[in-house]
Structures are given as C-alpha cells and as structure tokens.
Amino acid sequence: MPGPGEAPLMIPLSRRSSWEAVHQLTQTPHRQDSQIRAIRESAAIRRGTRMIKVLSARQVAGFLKGWLPAGFCYREWDVAHLRTPDELRLLRTDADTHADQPNVAFALRWRAIDPLDYDIPTPEAYPGLVAMPSGYRIGSPVLGTGFTPSSQHIIPEYVTASMADLPLSAHASIVGYTPDGQEATLFTYQPEQRGWLRMAGPQWRGLLAGLGSAVDQEYLPLANNDRGTSRLVGTFRGAEYDTVADPPEFRVLAMTRAARYPVESLSRRTRYASWRGVRCTVVSADGGWVRLRLSQPDSEQVVSIGAQCHERGIYEAWAPAAELTDRELQDTPYPL
C-alpha cells in the first residue's frame, strides 16, 4: 500500500477505454493526448515519497563510493509488484555489457525531499532525450509519454531535474532480490557518519558476491571528494549548515544529537558550468579536468562535447577546467 498522503496511479477504465487500449496509448511514442496526460499526472511525487532505482552491480559499487541518485527512477509504489530479478530487469538503466548474474537484482531506495527535484520526461521537457538516436543511447528509448517501455505494464517514470545528482535522504538503502522474490536490505546510508553500513547477514552473502570488498566490510566510509556534487544546505539562526534530509524533518548535519537542530530554510545546491555552449552539471573534478553531465541531452550536444552515455539518460564528458564558462553554484529552495 502507498504511504500516508500518497496517490496511486489512477487509470479510469470503461467499455470504451479498456486496460489494453490505455496500455497501447502509453506505449505510443510522443503520444500526449488529454487522457494519457491526466493518467500520468495522477502519479504525483510528494515530500517523503519512497523512490527506487534498479541498479547493476557496477552501479551498486559506485553508490558505495559516493554516487548520488540521478537520471531515471520510479516511485516504489508503482513497481512494488515487480519482485524477481527477471521482472526488475525491465527497469535497469545500465548497459547489457554490465550484466550481472541472472539470479540477483539490486535497487537503491530513498525518500523524495521535494517534488521540485523530479521531472516527467516528455517531449516538452526533454525534447532531445525523446528524439535521441538509438546509436547514442543505452537501454530502452524514451517514449515521451511519461511511461517506461513495457509490453505488459503501465509504469510511470521520472528523471531527476536537469539530470542532476540529488542528495540522499537519511536511511536510504541498497536492497537485493532473489529469484523467488525475497528482498534483503544490504546497506543503509548513515548521513552523520558519511558512509554505508552493511546490514546483510551470512545468509545473504550470495547477493553480495559480485560487489568486491563490500562483502567483508561492515562500514564503508565515503571520501569527502565523492562523485556526487549536490548538497543539501539549511540555515539555523542565520548560519548555514550542511543538512540531513529525514522527511518530513530536516536537521543540521552533526555527529552529536544535541547539535542536530531543525533548519529554518532548506535548499539543494548544485554546481553548473558551460562548455562549448552546452549547459551541464559538474559531477567531479580531477586536477585540471572536470567531469560534466548534460542537463538537456540531445544528439548535437553529445557530438559537440564528445559525451558518452553511461546509463539510460546520463551523458557525461571530461573537459579542461580552464575552458569552462558560466560556472555557478545554483540553489534550489524548498518550502518548509
């Protein structure tokens, strides 16, 4: 069942509008009639909505080193009926070259901080992504209806706003799935300790087999210069602090409980820059080079900066730091 205040996807059916007919409309590229739009808008994200992103073992390893959620994702409620690795393969964003053992699937779960962080990938919002040629993309095409391609299911999909990294909420988790549909929490995110705590016991070691050294570590700390570049910042009594998201609560990031004051304002701070006229978010830096991610991917921008598709919807390239223009830290304020 959805959480308090959550709205399930609403599909009005009748003799004239069967499930099969609605499903066909959701799978018709660029179809944006009023019926499909109304159905899609019924699947709204609210503060605290449980989100999910299906991962490969390569992506799990990345998150354990500091990656943040970006690109395509789903409301957990909309995909709760998919329980086995075979079923969850539909939602994967990684390339087939990173295929894992077929009897294992992984996913990242977190809670939405604010609806402002998510977009519906329609032709109006992301025209280049919808029109991306097959040779330039990984995974299934973006239909533009707001639903993921599927021959059996009607599943609303989302992208993070501008394809930017989003700060993880407290108690985010990485879970594993077995062929019989069992689910195990493998790791939980500890924001005050800046790391992941392994939760899986000996009976789940098979799920961890492809994750390298994570099998033997109880705690995996994150480096201060981690891959993610979006930060959650808040103010308390006029001073600015890094902030922990624990919807509906937001507090100062502090090791001691006594210092975890509730913040009075809240924003997501993300780094942006332009290169060769292309607007990007800054993902990481290494010496005189900066890793950029396209905010509005299209085929011309991909060619212009030599971007590579790393997962469905995510296009990144390395650029000389000296050639970047329009650098800025952009704050997205959230209402409290």
Describe each PLM feature range.
Residues 3, 8-336:
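Short, surface-exposed polybasic-aromatic patches that bind anionic ligands, especially phosphate groups
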